[in-house]
Amino acid sequence: MRAIVEEHDKIGHACKLSFVPSPRERATIPRMNTTTSKDAASESDPARSFQLSKPDLLTLAAIAIVATLITNLLHEGLGHGGMCIATGGQPLVISTVHFACSAEPRLVAAGGTLANLVFGAICWAVSRALKRAARWRYFFWLLMTFNLFEAGGYFLFSGIGNIGDWTAVVAGWQPVWAWRVGLAALGVITYFILFVPLCLRELRPFLGDAAKTRVRRAWQLTLVPYLTSGILSTAAGALNPVSPILILISAAAASFGGHSGLAWMASLLHGPRIPSTELQMPEIERSWGWIIAALVLAILFIAGLGPGVKLHSV
């Protein structure tokens, strides 16, 4: 109900009416304004909006597929293949799990890991330069993570298991145990002490600033590419022309093993060791362009490169 206040104008004796809100209505109005201001603040603040939304998982998987393909080609093609040509060898066959060269010097074996390290650093710089393009920054973050994890993983894998690229690099060097211990130690330092913390810190712009939200979003942004990359790499590796053993020691080891940091590093966000950052990216929304491109490239990767491509006859 509203009370009517009647005021008499001294000159015209006119009657002026005004409406005064009741006490209940006066109490209601500020609440409405407060709610509206909170809604506006949450819409304009990416960190707040992260608490109510989640990245599109299908797009995350698509980006992971493209990043997996590129990382593989960098390692096998540009790394091993480029070093083969640079050392005077003749490229023979390339697949998703091996590269055959007419000569097998140590540098050819080391070329894959060296390419991973170089391009991991390049992708780190590119991702930091992207301030608003969420999908592209996440793509380069994944490229950085895949490349650095594979590099550190190869050191560790060769040192502990005596299998892989760096086993060929140090073959014949004495004492054998010292080189294996050195490779294992290098793998532990690069993978667990350098690369995992670095990659997790670079993921912070996608996480928001609320503690529970950060951990939940980190699991989504790391587990999806981990599983996607592992499944794709293993499926393509199953068609390799050399030996079924390469499915285990190359395809599965490099993906499920080498990328395994993605499966657990989100747990490091508990506690104050890795604080949030002021820069927060927009949400990663669905992109049919990424999804369609990923499907086409995945088919070509499995059916084309999986069985191997002959580059030169022996």
Regions found by a protein language model. Name each.
Residues 7-11:
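Alpha-helix boundary/capping motif
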Residues 29-314:
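Hydrophobic transmembrane alpha-helices and their immediate loop junctions
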